[in-house]
């Protein structure tokens, strides 16, 4: 996997060996394998572990494991405790969203304070496929069908080339220890339902499902790039600004096909929804 990691990092222009990386280390198979590969490939990184205190003794077990791993491998480690339930209630958001906001807010602080170049997360090919189906079900449009991007600003995902199965097999072959999150097997969350119920069925129907979905996601990612370029070009032709006021050339818009989706793509960035755009076209 070392050569595949280095090839993926190079192909996607994620980072170089002189860059300082902050690696999100949960203690699970994905992040421990990524940390092991990064270490053995000679990349410079420190690790960051979030303790959300959502799973009682299991949360403390994870933190102890990560601390021991970092000490054994002489890797600088940052650990942060969070009152996730309190934050959730304060912000009136879901528990999942609360953990996400707390996690990335702290990561951004570390990057700014410690001078890291990139944040590396251990998302893999299965995560990307799950995200594709979640967005498909939610109706996010073409922008949501590219799965998880290898690079988003200074967030990089070097393990996207590998499936979960391959990661776990590598860990077992190398006797790499990791911890299991018991909530990953629960199917009350949409992502877990897709992982444990939908994907096994799709693999039974199409044994090459993992390879096929990965290729299709890559094609959709490239298609979206072309799509976005065309939208930007048309937006520049149809929108103008005078004294801080935006003007849309309706007559020119009406000559475009399909005008509905074009209008939505132009105006959605200003807070307009699909219903607003339909009202404009029917006025």
Predicted regions and their residues:
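Charged, solvent-exposed alpha-helical segments that act as regulatory interaction surfaces
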Residues: 142, 207, 211, 226-229
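Core alpha/beta nucleotide-donor-binding catalytic domains of modification enzymes
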Residues: 1-199, 229
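Internal, active-site/partner-interface "lid" segment
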Residues: 184-189, 210-221
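Conserved anion/nucleotide-ligand pocket segment
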Residues: 195-213
């Amino acid at each position: 996997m070392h050569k595949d990691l280095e090839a993926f990092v190079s192909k996607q222009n994620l980072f170089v060996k002189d860059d300082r990386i902050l690696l999100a280390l949960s203690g699970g198979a994905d992040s421990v394998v990524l940390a092991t590969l990064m270490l053995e490939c000679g990349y410079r990184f420190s690790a960051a572990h979030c303790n959300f205190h959502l799973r009682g003794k299991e949360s403390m077990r994870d933190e102890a494991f990560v601390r021991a791993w970092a000490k054994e491998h002489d890797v600088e480690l940052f650990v942060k405790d969070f009152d996730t339930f309190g934050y959730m209630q304060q912000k009136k958001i879901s528990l999942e969203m609360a953990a996400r906001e707390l996690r990335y807010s702290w990561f951004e602080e570390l990057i700014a304070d410690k001078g890291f170049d990139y944040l590396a997360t251990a998302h893999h090919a299965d995560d990307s496929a799950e995200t594709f189906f979640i967005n498909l079900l939610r109706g996010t449009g073409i922008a949501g069908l590219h799965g998880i991007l290898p690079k988003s600003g200074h967030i990089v995902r070097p393990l996207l080339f590998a499936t979960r199965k391959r990661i776990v097999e590598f860990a077992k072959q190398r006797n790499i220890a990791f911890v299991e999150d018991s909530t990953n097997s629960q199917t009350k969350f949409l992502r877990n339902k897709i992982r444990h119920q939908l994907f096994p069925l799709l693999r039974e129907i199409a044994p090459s499902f993992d390879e096929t979905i990965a290729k299709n996601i890559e094609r959709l990612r490239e298609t979206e790039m072309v799509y976005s370029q065309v939208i930007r070009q048309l937006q520049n032709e149809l929108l103008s600004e005078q004294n801080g006021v935006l003007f849309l050339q309706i007559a020119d818009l009406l000559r475009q096909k399909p005008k509905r989706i074009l209008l939505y793509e132009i105006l959605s960035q200003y807070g307009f929804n699909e219903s607003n755009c339909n009202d404009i076209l029917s006025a």
